[in-house]
Amino acid sequence: RRVLFRLGCSDVDPIMGVEVDPKDGFRAIGEPKALIQHNCDKYGWEVPGKNNEEPSQGWNEGPCVLKHNGRYYLQYAAPGTQYRIYGDGNYVGDNPLGPFEYVEDNPFSFKPGGFIGGAGHGHTFKDKYGNYWHVASMTISVRHWFERRLGLFPVVVSEKYGMYALTTFADYPFWIPDRKVDFEKEDISMGWNLLSYKKKISSSSYLEGYEPELANDEQVETWWAAQTGNAGEWLQIDLGKTMEVNAIQVNF
């Protein structure tokens, strides 16, 4: 067995790869090889900025490799973890250290909208039933530039459409399969709709800038905060009519 190491986290340097010897302190065998160069001039999703508008190079980072049907998918993230447009792309090759070919429908993992955005710096893995999933970083970036959460997305690996993560309805509950599932054909959504969005809301108290209306505006970057952390503080939402409630999701 060979042990291969990929590295890179830079707005200048490329994603690199090298074989290492685990029996000798993971010493490099040979010289590191450049695997992915920066290509902001070719691939707009690698351009940094809230809407990919900044005149600079993005950060290519978080490389990992998935082997599927004898081919190697070299995954990487761009352009920066603080953006909702943060995503993951693929290069594909026949050898673990390349050469690799860019996949034209990149990014394969991308979620700029919804309650929480971002789907980059991730890794694709297979569960015990043979289903592929992608776990990725999602941004908040309010209290700290790198304030994040993790998202989990089902992945389709298709002969026709290649590899892509299903992020469209990722804000809503889905069931975790206990069998092999064709995500391209079978919907694992629970089918539950959002009931609380911008409904009438009140609270026992609030801090300025953290009003109760910010608790159900479907933006992870805003929230309600009571004046104290004492018992007895409360938040109330009026749905306007009797509704069936299947689940309550609290984000904190």
Can you annotate each of these PLM segments?
Residues 57-101, 109:
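Loop/turn-rich, solvent-exposed surfaces of beta-rich toroidal or solenoidal domains
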Residues 22-56, 91-114, 160-170:
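Blade-edge beta-strand/turn elements of extracellular beta-propeller
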